[in-house]
Swiss-Prot record:
Cellular component GO terms held in the UniProt record: cytosolic small ribosomal subunit
Pfam families, sorted: Ribosomal_S17 (PF00366)
rRNA-binding recorded as keyword: yes
Function: One of the primary rRNA binding proteins, it binds specifically to the 5'-end of 16S ribosomal RNA.
MF-aspect GO terms: rRNA binding; structural constituent of ribosome
Entries under CDD domains matching the protein: Ribosomal_uS17 (cd00364)
Family annotation (InterPro entries): NA-bd_OB-fold (IPR012340), Ribosomal_uS17 (IPR000266), Ribosomal_uS17_bact/chlr (IPR019984), Ribosomal_uS17_CS (IPR019979)
A GO biological-process term: translation
Protein name per its UniProtKB record: Small ribosomal subunit protein uS17
Subunit structure: Part of the 30S ribosomal subunit.
Taxonomic lineage: Bacteria, Pseudomonadati, Pseudomonadota, Gammaproteobacteria, Vibrionales
Family: Belongs to the universal ribosomal protein uS17 family.
UniProt organism field: Vibrio parahaemolyticus serotype O3:K6 (strain RIMD 2210633)
C-alpha cells in the first residue's frame, strides 16, 4: 500500500542554510467568537538538495521522514520564482 504524501504550498522566507530553506505556510482560520477569518502563518524547514530556491519564491513541499531535529519536509518544485 502506498501512502499519500501531504503537500503544502508556501513562500520561502530564508535560504541561508546549506541545502535547507524556511517556508512560511499561510492559512485562514475563523475566529471562534467574532467569526472573522484571520490569517495564520506556520514556518517549517524543508530540504532543498540543489540549493535552487531563493527568498520570496513560491514552492511546493511534501512531508517526509525526519531529516534532522526540525526538518521533516522536502522540496517538490518551485512554483514561481520571486521577481527581482
Amino acid at each position: 500500500m502506498s501512502e499519500v504524501k501531504r503537500t503544502q504550498q508556501g513562500r520561502v522566507v530564508s535560504d541561508k542554510m546549506d541545502k535547507s530553506i524556511t517556508v512560511a505556510i499561510e492559512r485562514f482560520v475563523k475566529h471562534p467568537i467574532y467569526g472573522k477569518f484571520v490569517k495564520r502563518t506556520t514556518k517549517v524547514h524543508a530540504h532543498d538538495e540543489n540549493n535552487e530556491c531563493g527568498i520570496g519564491d513560491t514552492v511546493e513541499i511534501a512531508e517526509c521522514r525526519p531529516l534532522s531535529k526540525t526538518k521533516s519536509w522536502t522540496l517538490v518544485k518551485v512554483v514561481e520564482k520571486a521577481k527581482m
